[in-house]
Amino acid sequence: NSSLAQETDQTKGKTLSLTYDFKEAGKPMKYSLYIPTSYDKQKKTPLIVALHGLGSSASAIMRYPGFTRHAEKHGYLVVAPTGYNSRGWYGSRGTGGGRGSDPENLGELSEKDVMNVLGITRLNFNIDENRIYLMGHSMGGGGTWHLGSKYPDIWAALGPIAPAAPRDTSRLEKMTHIPVIVIQGDKDGLVRGARRWVAKMKELKMEHEYLEIEGGGHVDVAFKHFPELFAFFNAYSKAGQKDAAETPTPAPKP
């Protein structure tokens, strides 16, 4: 990755499949990266960290229809970690969870992978430290809740989509300053968990938006509502105040 920043002109507008040496796991680890054509190393660029769902991969979430197109349109760099493997849960279900050939500390390694990839990206690119966003689908949505609450000083806003939400909503008390957009289909079995977390955000008077999509399932909501997701992210920087960088159009109500 040391030469990645120097080669940026050749890699702009492309989704790259990269690897790094995951020392804690003792193996190379894949991640995916999208660099917008507008990227200029002299200017600070917003970053989205994207967490894939159970059984999926870093490259798969980057291929969600419209994801990189919206990143290109709005000038975001996007990075998607593996989370150790396709079932690591990013630490949202504890430090263990390994079975079969998985390491016993699978959850710990899954979380560490995300933070390593974030660190590598911040090192290689001129990232706007006030505009680092975290989003994820399904298992990745659960990871978004977990990592949002564990590292609350990093994120400008969160975007859990059809999240496999942890049981403990008290985690929200550590991140009341972070704006959150939740996108959830009402035909998805996970809708009850999403409603529970949204109710807790209301109770805590958190800045949030909840899009419950009528007729929406578990998968289709993940790629049909990028306009609302990016509009929300555009509206906030880490200061927790509406950002004047871009005035978003209000998201349509479901």
What are these regions (language model features)?
Residues 213-219:
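Histidine-bearing beta->alpha loop at or near hydrolase active sites
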